Amino acid sequence: MNKPGTWISFVIIHVIFMGVWGALIELPEKNGFPATLGYVVWALTMIPATIVAMIINKWKLDYDKRSVLYGCLSGLLGAAGQLVLFYTLKTAPAYLVFPILSLTPVVTILLAVLFLKESTGMIGWAGIGIAILAIFLLSYVPPDNASASGYLWIILTIIPLVAWGAQGFVMRFANDTMKAESIFFYMTISSLALIPVALWMTDFSKPINYGLNGPYLAAGIQILNSFGALCLVYAFRYGKAIIIAPMTTALSPVLTVIISLIIYAVIPHIITVAGIALAILSALLMGNAESKMEKKTDIKAPKSALIK
């Protein structure tokens, strides 16, 4: 598998899968399949991807206390962010939400600066500054825009943003001592562990669509996420993080935005367009800065986008 150019194949698959997933994730909920049950389907689709990962790794699993702690903590942060994301997309369209979510490196970098006393350099700080401006612009919703109103959607979006950024920070330590397949395994276990919470949050007194465009459509969409995440694992394994991190951080949201705009058949306000563009630029800069920080500290590159 480790041939020249292998990593680019994994990057392309990851970008396509995650970009399409981001744009379509809200469709089952709009068809009457609750967002909380969408989380349940997502967690279950992690199982086949994990089986593939474990087969590739010949069923070897890191099971010391540190590995279990880092793996499960990473998984819980990712799963909690995912659970909130499903609800967030009930209040705002994907073309507004995902550009903000692409800014997860802001949190990862700030945590590294605060707790590890690392320096991010001018590129990182520029990315953070642009990110703040992007969020400010994206918070503007024209009065005639019925797809999003108020500021609740921004607050909800910040929750997975912080959770996934913290996940990336934790994974800096996990990647230093664990195989990627083991991290993936514990993430799946953690995701499955939150299923009872999702079921508890579900209002079963309301009609639920159990048809083809409900849970079955959700499964088809969520499998893109699980295998897209697995492709990212191997992209980092066979390629250079300083190239892969900016590409994957920036390109997936671009594809999500394009597809989402087509689905909604809207032309966003010029201020929104500027916010989207700045968010993507910020993600590109911070992905590059984050990779350089990893290289300086001799720690493997974090897969902060591993599970989303």
Kindly give the residue locations of the regions a language model identified:
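Structural motif at transmembrane-helix junctions in multi-pass transporters
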Residues: 30-37, 83-100, 176-182, 231-248
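Loop-to-transmembrane-helix transition segments
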Residues: 6-14, 60-84, 152-160, 207-227, ...
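Alpha-helical transmembrane segments of compact multi-pass small-molecule transporters, enriched
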Residues: 45-49, 100-114, 190-194, 247-263, ...
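Hydrophobic/aromatic residues within transmembrane alpha-helices
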Residues: 28, 38, 88, 114-116, ...
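Hydrophobic/small/kink-forming positions within alpha-helical transmembrane segments
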Residues: 15, 19, 23, 51, ...
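Juxtamembrane helix-loop boundary signature in multi-pass membrane transporters
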Residues: 1-13, 106-162, 274-308
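Transmembrane alpha-helices of multi-pass small-molecule transport proteins
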Residues: 32-80, 162-166, 184-203, 216, ...
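Transmembrane alpha-helical segments that form core, pore/gating elements
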Residues: 11, 15-36, 55, 145-203, ...
